[in-house]
Amino acid sequence: DVRYSDYLLIYHSTITPIEKQQGKLDNAKDNDFMEQHYKRLALDEAENYAWALKLAKENDLTVTDKEVDETILEHRKIGGVERSEEGFKKILEDNFGLTMKEYRRMIYLSLVKEKVSQAIDTNAVQLAAQVESLIKSGKDLKAISEELGDKVLYEETGGLVDKMNVDGGRSLKAMSLSTGEISDKFVSSSGDGYYFVKLVAKTDSTVNYTSIKISFTEFDRQMKEIRDSGKIKELIKIDRQES
C-alpha cells in the first residue's frame, strides 16, 4: 500500500522550491498542467517507495536511525560547509516546506530504495565482477568501457574539478587514491549504481578523474512491469501529462 502522506511529502518537497524560484504561473492552464505533472511524478515515486518497502521486508533489509542520521549529517556538509542543526532545519522549512521529521522520512525511504535496488540487481553485481576482472588484467577504464559498450557509462572530468563536486561521490573517492590508481567498486551517493574511479591528478582541493558507472536497472524494470500489467490500483486520479 502507498502511504498518502508519503505522496504529499514528495509533492510538497518538489513543488515548493519551484514555486519559490518561479512563482505561480500567470496562465491558469499552464499552472494546472505544472501541478498535475509534479503530482504525477510524486505519486509514481511514492509507488516506487511502497514497492521498495515490500521488497525490503521480503529480503530482510533494514535502515537504522543511525544510517538516517549519518546521511543527514552528510547533507548538512554539502558544499564543504557544515551547517548547524537549526540552520539546516530552517533551510528545509524555507526551501522545501519540510519539517525535520518529514525530511527524516524521505531520507529513510530513499535509503530503503537504494538498498533494495542494490540487493536485487544480480546483473549489476555480475557486470561489476567482470569489470574487476578486467582491471586486474591490467586494462584501463576507457578500454574496459569500449569492450563492454553500452553496458557501462564511461566519463572523464576533462580537467580539475572541486573535490566537493556533486557527482555521486566520485570526486571524494578519487581524492583518496594515488595517481593512476583505480578504486574498488562503490555505490553512488544517490544509490543508483556502482562506480569505479581512476585518479588522473589532484591538488589539495581539486581532482581530475575518469570513471565507469554500472546502473541498477532491475528495480525500474520491475516497476515498469507492474505498471504495464495494470497491477497498481490508484485511489486518486492523476493523469499522465503529454508534453
Regions found by a protein language model. Name each.
Residues 1-98, 102:
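N-terminal targeting/tethering segments
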Residues 16, 77, 150, 228-232:
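Residue-level marker of structural boundaries
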Residues 30, 161-170:
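Short, positively charged
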Residues 67-76, 149-150, 156-163, 239-242:
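Short linear loop/turn motifs
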Residues 77-85, 142, 151-157:
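Secretory-pathway/luminal and periplasmic proteins that interact with or process carbohydrate-rich
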Residues 87-136, 140-146, 166-243:
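PPIase-associated folding chaperone regions across multiple families
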